[in-house]
């Protein structure tokens, strides 16, 4: 397998406006990146260029089609906590699809990603945790905070939420 040179990938930013993103990622690594993964929306040319054939179902779908499928799947869950976990998994795998689904169904989904369900999500964090997302600082690591904050992964942090989780009640 040869690594493609930096190529542009056309992404839909969730509003219907395409934008191009330069990336050297390909194959499974591209699909594992929630920012760059477009799921079944990769075109045949993109699938060839980024070595995705065989890693995705052969059918190419628009963002609208993906949103419809995910909404149908979401509505099939029995509880809001299950729907919350489903949406967190979607956010961890395909942020474009997550944000499009949320934006197009905000009245229905806001109570799931925010109050009241987010409280239950926090209370069940250990059970629902799938992948690291964010920055975790804890008392046992207080002497290493400078080293933790120096991690290059946190260079582009835009939002910080601080909580001790003590006020989350259902």
Predicted features, each with a name:
Residues 26-28, 35-135, 154:
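Conserved, well-structured core domains of diverse proteins
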Residues 168-170:
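Conserved small/polar residues in nucleotide/adenosyl-binding loops
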Residues 1-37:
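Basic/polar N-terminal segments that are highly enriched at the extreme N-terminus
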Residues 156-158:
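A general structural motif
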Residues 133-143:
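Short coil-to-helix leader/linker segments, especially the first N-terminal amphipathic alpha-helix
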Residues 138-140, 160-164:
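Short beta-strand segments
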Residues 142-152:
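Short alpha-helical segments and helix-capping/turn motifs at coil-helix boundaries
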């Amino acid at each position: 397998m040869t690594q493609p040179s930096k190529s542009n990938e056309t992404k839909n930013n969730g509003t219907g406006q395409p934008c191009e993103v330069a990336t050297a990622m390909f194959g499974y690594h591209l699909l594992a990146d929630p920012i760059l993964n477009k799921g079944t929306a990769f075109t045949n040319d993109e699938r060839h260029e980024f070595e995705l054939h065989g890693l995705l179902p052969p059918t190419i779908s628009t963002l609208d089609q993906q949103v419809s499928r995910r909404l149908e799947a979401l509505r099939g869950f029995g509880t809001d906590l299950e729907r919350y976990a489903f949406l967190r998994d979607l956010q961890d795998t395909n942020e474009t699809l997550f944000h499009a689904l949320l934006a197009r169904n905000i009245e229905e989904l806001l109570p799931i990603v925010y109050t009241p369900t987010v409280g239950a999500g926090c209370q069940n964090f250990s059970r629902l945790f799938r992948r690291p997302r964010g920055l975790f600082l804890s008392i046992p690591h207080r002497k290493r905070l400078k080293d933790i904050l120096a991690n290059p992964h946190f260079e582009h942090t835009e939002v910080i939420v601080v909580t001790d989780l003590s006020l989350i009640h259902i």
